[in-house]
């Protein structure tokens, strides 16, 4: 008897602040969403609108660096977290990502934020993403596409509402502003349960 693979919900954050051989920032986000949806064992179910945010470096906002376009994708995956993370790194490489500087500018950045609520900390992967709770550029588009979303706390003490985390992040660092970016939907799946959120609802 064939065993059915169990799908778990996953949250993936996308960002780009440099054009590349495959297009400008917006086009790179679109190509990344297409590539994620094409992965074996993965199906995208929803995507936020695109937002624009200032470049965040290790010592804070860098107003001299190109701004980022960011979005969040919801998907269902029948892979292990490690396999999915490896596949995301493969997409980054295919789209011209070169890992030279921590927190440096990049053509594409794909972060695995949450994987079915799992908590994991190994040399290879940390779930949930250890800095997602404080990043408005992740929380704002995530709240847009999934208003009732919760993020498990890494210390195992429960979960926090993404909407509440976003308010706290904006209060701590108002300079990390999130601005809607006018663009066509990153993903539509008419009749299959996929949705695309209106970028005008991001704040």
Please state what every model-predicted region is.
Residues 2-12, 18-107, 116-117:
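Nucleotide and nucleotide-moiety/phosphate-recognizing core
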